[in-house]
Amino acid sequence: MPKMKTNSGSKKRFTLTGTGKIKRKHAFHSHILTKKSKKRKRNLCYSTTVDTTNVSQVKELLAMK
């Protein structure tokens, strides 16, 4: 059976940390920023980890299963 291909869109969006968690960026921080508050924009600029409910799906896209 051939190897599973990595989803090319996913490999641009997700990175694996040293502890095995999957890191992602927040959405809604690219345009139409004038109506968003300073606090909201600041919180959106930081990266976060993928939720535990979605980890298996993201790992499948990254061909890690």
Swiss-Prot record:
InterPro entries: Ribosomal_bL35 (IPR001706), Ribosomal_bL35-like (IPR021137), Ribosomal_bL35_CS (IPR018265), Ribosomal_bL35_sf (IPR037229)
Keywords in alphabetical order: Ribonucleoprotein, Ribosomal protein
Domain of life: Bacteria
Entry GO terms, CC: cytosolic large ribosomal subunit
Region called Disordered, residue ranges: 1-20
Pfam families linked to this entry: Ribosomal_L35p
MF-aspect GO terms: structural constituent of ribosome
Coiled-coil segments on the chain, per record: none
Gene3D superfamilies cross-referenced by the UniProt entry: 4.10.410.60
Gene Ontology biological process terms in this record: translation
Keyword Ribonucleoprotein in record: yes
NCBIfam families found in the cross-reference section: rpmI_bact
Family of this protein: Belongs to the bacterial ribosomal protein bL35 family.
HAMAP family: Ribosomal_bL35 (MF_00514)
Protein name: Large ribosomal subunit protein bL35
Organism in which the protein naturally occurs: Bacteroides thetaiotaomicron (strain ATCC 29148 / DSM 2079 / JCM 5827 / CCUG 10774 / NCTC 10582 / VPI-5482 / E50)
